[in-house]
Amino acid sequence: MEERKEEGEAEIQEHGPEHWFSKWERQCLAEAEQDEQLSPELQEEAAAAAQPEHKQQKLWHLFQNSATAVAQLYKDRVCQQPGLSLWVPFQNAATAVTNLYKESVDTHQRSFDIGIQIGYQRRNKDVLAWVKKRRRTIRREDLISFLCGKVPPPRNSRAPPRLTVVSPNRATSTETSSSVETDLQPFREAIALHGLSGAMASISVRSSTPGSPTHVSSGPNASRRRNGLHDVDLNTFITEEMALHLDNGGTRKRTSAQCGDVITDSPTHKRNRML
């Protein structure tokens, strides 16, 4: 009996945090420290996630294939020759887009699983480290304040505790309604960097003017341009098509705006109408 009493007193002797836990509690803590290591599979995934260059390079390569296949499908549709089937270009584009989607979903799921596992382990590690630093008896408000990341209320005050929650700064999202066009710069860069024509990758289609080399005028020259499309490389063809459609859209917007200004703001027009 005396030996058991001495062992119990030695286990709960309060000379330091290491003496606050019983033998069973120390065994649980030791097992928890051993479980902090990830499984071999998750360790490989975590090592790959720590160096995302390989995954990003693979996704970028798949995106290049998808962009090139879609652009080739559009070119073959515009420059379709009699008796030429569009099934093969369509099949290539569908396959490239499907591979890009599958790889993106798999990468996201693996990263999500690793994040959850690491989050659980980090939470347990933080809570156990906090418990080791506390006394044998932990107050309820101390535990809740630690888990919620708040300051515990004062213990001597009789008034109900007031928790001041500082709301985080809400970043105001500024949406620019002036430009409704989709940014297709990554799409054009993917086509240009696919080995077709790297010189056209940095040209901005939206900033092209009627005097710039990328501007394509509509009218009789359009038919002449389409007759020679078979000799144009894919990147140049897509760049000219985007410039043509974007410039035509901008011209229509500017024309309608100018007409509205003339009707509403011109004093000569108002004077003639009154006469």
Curated annotation (Swiss-Prot):
Role, per record? Acts as a central player within a network of stress response pathways promoting cellular adaptability. The E3 ligase HUWE1 assists HAPSTR1 in controlling stress signaling and in turn, HUWE1 feeds back to promote the degradation of HAPSTR1. HAPSTR1 represents a central coordination mechanism for stress response programs. Functions as a negative regulator of TP53/P53 in the cellular response to telomere erosion and probably also DNA damage. May attenuate p53/TP53 activation through the E3 ubiquitin ligase HUWE1.
Q: Which PANTHER family match?
A: HUWE1-ASSOCIATED PROTEIN MODIFYING STRESS RESPONSES 1, UPF0472 PROTEIN C16ORF72
| Modifications the protein undergoes after translation, according to the UniProt entry | Ubiquitinated by HUWE1. Promotes HAPSTR1 degradation through polyubiquitination.
A single GO molecular function term of this UniProt record: ubiquitin protein ligase binding
Residues passing through the membrane, by range: none
- Protein name per the record: HUWE1-associated protein modifying stress responses
Write down the Pfam families for this protein, in alphabetical order: TAPR1-like
Query: Which parts of this chain are annotated as the region Disordered?
Result: 32-51, 155-181, 204-228, 250-275
User: Could you tell me which residues carry Phosphoserine?
Assistant: S167, S212
Entry keyword 4Fe-4S: no
Protein's GO biological process: negative regulation of signal transduction by p53 class mediator; regulation of cellular response to stress
Which superkingdom, per the lineage?
Eukaryota
Task: Cite the record's note on assembly.
Answer: Homooligomer. Heterooligomer with HAPSTR2; the interaction is direct and stabilizes HAPSTR1. Interacts with HUWE1.
Task: Tell me yes or no: is DNA repair among this UniProt entry's keywords.
Answer: no
Renumbered to this chain, the Low complexity biased-composition regions fall at 172-181
Q: Which organism is it from?
A: Mus musculus (Mouse)
InterPro entries registered for this protein in UniProt: HAPR1, HAPSTR1-like
Q: Which gene encodes it?
A: Hapstr1
What does the UniProt keyword field contain? Cytoplasm, Nucleus, Phosphoprotein, Stress response, Ubl conjugation
Q: Which GO terms describe its cellular component?
A: cytoplasm; nucleus
